[in-house]
Amino acid sequence: LYPSAISKAFGYSTNYQNETNLVNGYGYWLKFADAEEISLIGELCDSQTVNVTTGWNLIGSISSPLDVNLIESNPHGLNTSQFYGYDNGYKIVDAIEPGRGYWVKVSQAGQLILSSQSLVMSKSAIKIVPTNDLPPKPPDVN
């Protein structure tokens, strides 16, 4: 998938799993020897509905930045943790950036709705509840 990656792509569903087919909306863990810029080819994705399960989920992004407070859910008002990105360790983020994956813990199964059309918080917006829990450790790819 990514010739310069030094690991396979890992998805997450209660544990890490090797993935050979990447699906829009979901996040994946890949390891590279050095920082690099990757070009993605395809159609722009301005909205995405992501199925999530109770507990930690690794989600993807859309083609434009999105403030996490504008993410909607089904059921409405789904409780989530803060969103975490990874940069030599987990960091709480305020926005979902294109081409990156993010961790979020949810209180129940449902759907997260990421849309560039979301301009104001709606009654279906998620409810972010701060937690001290951190996402799962990265997969062992040594």
Model segments located where?
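N-terminal exported-region signature
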Residues: 1-142
